[in-house]
Amino acid sequence: MKLQLHIYDNQGETFDRYTAVYLASVEYDGSYACLGMSDNPTQPQGFGQHSSADDGDHLGMRISIMQLPLTCRRLVMSDYKAIMSDQG
């Protein structure tokens, strides 16, 4: 099954280097729910914040979920499962 998800890496241009865009979660204005993350989003010195974003390469280079650090991957998949279960 193909994930309804795009992952971007801005190569460290900002502290929230990675962005996960949840394509199954469309916001009212046509943007998507997303998660911006540093390399260590669950640590006290890390960053992980939900927001909304337009999908596209302005977020960085598209990468596969397997290219994310393990902590980021776990967080993204936890969100993804919750989004998909909400949609029934």
Short names for language-model regions:
Residues 7, 63-65, 83:
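Weak global preference for isoleucine
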Residues 13-74:
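Acidic, low-complexity, intrinsically disordered interaction modules
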Residues 76-88:
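A short beta-strand-loop micro-motif that forms or neighbors metal/cofactor-
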Residues 1-15:
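Negatively charged, low-complexity tracts enriched in Asp/Glu with abundant Ser/Thr
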